[in-house]
């Protein structure tokens, strides 16, 4: 076993012994059914070595982690023109807040809060039918992982559509300012479905490898984005990837990351590793509580914080 294998196993054992697991996302009925005892951790280093602990192959709803990949696709489609429709600043507000949109003329603060991700989804949808846009997103996820089995959890998507009134309000408000080009129902349908993609920690860590290695998958040699674009996506992940808990994550973990209310976290150690953690219990900001604890321990023990050891 490598040092990384040992560290990952130790962390998985430590997390299993803890009782402070946070609370699952009750406002999405399907997510409220998830057992809060689950935990997985997978790290894939630059050589392609996989260190796995806990429920590494248990699929979960990636939720807002999908926003990293839709951001990548939207930037590929219209480039830096995207930043005319969505900002790059932390919000300091809950992920589904409508308050800032009123003051900022319908322009969302960043692509990782719900309003921003809906605007990004609208870019991907333009020129397509909703089914085609979803197909593009799924093909991208399957390309990144080399796994054709990745799919949308239709029960979760339907659950979100039935209860996503706040997201509908955000979308309609942006539409009133001309930020969205497509019918609101179409954009929301694609948004709810890509948030309902189900992946395991192993699959998610595979998907994030291009961000850890200057836009390129080192195992396949495939270039996904330019080095500069990978760096900028990582920068937005660091400053905005955990809603109004982004500063706390940067302080404790010191890595770019993106959380989802399904309990997953994708973290990037630039030049070193792509990391996925999952624990469905959330903290007050809607981020995985023990996922953050595990990543803090990993970053500290491996000396991976971008701010130094």
Swiss-Prot record:
SUPFAM superfamilies from the UniProt entry: beta-lactamase/transpeptidase-like
UniProt-recorded Gene Ontology molecular function terms: glutaminase activity
Positions bound to substrate: 64, 114, 160, 167, 191, 243, 261
Keywords from the UniProt entry: Hydrolase
Listed EC numbers: 3.5.1.2
Subunit-structure text: Homotetramer.
Protein name: Glutaminase
Organism of origin: Rhodopseudomonas palustris (strain BisB18)
């Amino acid at each position: 076993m490598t040092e990384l294998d040992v560290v990952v196993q130790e962390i998985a054992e430590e997390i299993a012994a803890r009782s402070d697991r946070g609370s699952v996302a009750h406002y999405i009925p399907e997510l409220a059914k998830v057992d809060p005892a689950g935990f997985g951790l997978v790290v894939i280093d630059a050589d392609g070595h996989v260190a796995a602990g806990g429920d590494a192959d248990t699929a979960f709803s990636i939720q807002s982690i999908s926003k990293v990949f839709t951001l990548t696709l939207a930037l590929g489609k219209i480039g830096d023109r995207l930043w005319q429709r969505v900002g790059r600043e932390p919000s300091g507000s809950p992920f589904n807040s409508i308050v800032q949109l009123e003051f900022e003329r319908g322009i969302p603060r960043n692509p990782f809060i719900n309003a921003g991700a809906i605007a990004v989804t609208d870019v991907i949808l333009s020129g397509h039918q909703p089914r085609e846009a979803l197909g593009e997103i799924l093909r991208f996820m399957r390309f990144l992982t080399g796994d054709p089995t990745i799919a949308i959890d239709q029960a979760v998507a339907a659950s979100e559509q039935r209860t996503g009134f706040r997201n509908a309000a955000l979308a309609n408000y942006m539409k009133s300012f001309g930020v969205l080009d497509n019918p609101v129902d179409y954009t929301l349908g694609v948004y709810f479905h890509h948030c309902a993609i189900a992946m395991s920690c192993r699959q998610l860590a595979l998907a994030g490898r291009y961000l850890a290695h200057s836009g390129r998958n080192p195992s396949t040699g495939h270039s996904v984005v330019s080095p500069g674009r990978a760096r900028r996506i990582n920068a937005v992940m660091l400053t905005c990837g955990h809603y109004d808990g982004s500063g706390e994550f940067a302080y404790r973990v010191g890595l770019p990351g993106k959380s989802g209310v399904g309990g997953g976290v994708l973290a990037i150690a630039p030049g070193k590793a792509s990391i996925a953690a999952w624990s469905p219990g959330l903290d007050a900001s809607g981020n995985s509580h023990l996922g953050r604890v595990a990543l803090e321990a990993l970053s500290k023990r491996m000396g991976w914080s971008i701010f130094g050891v």
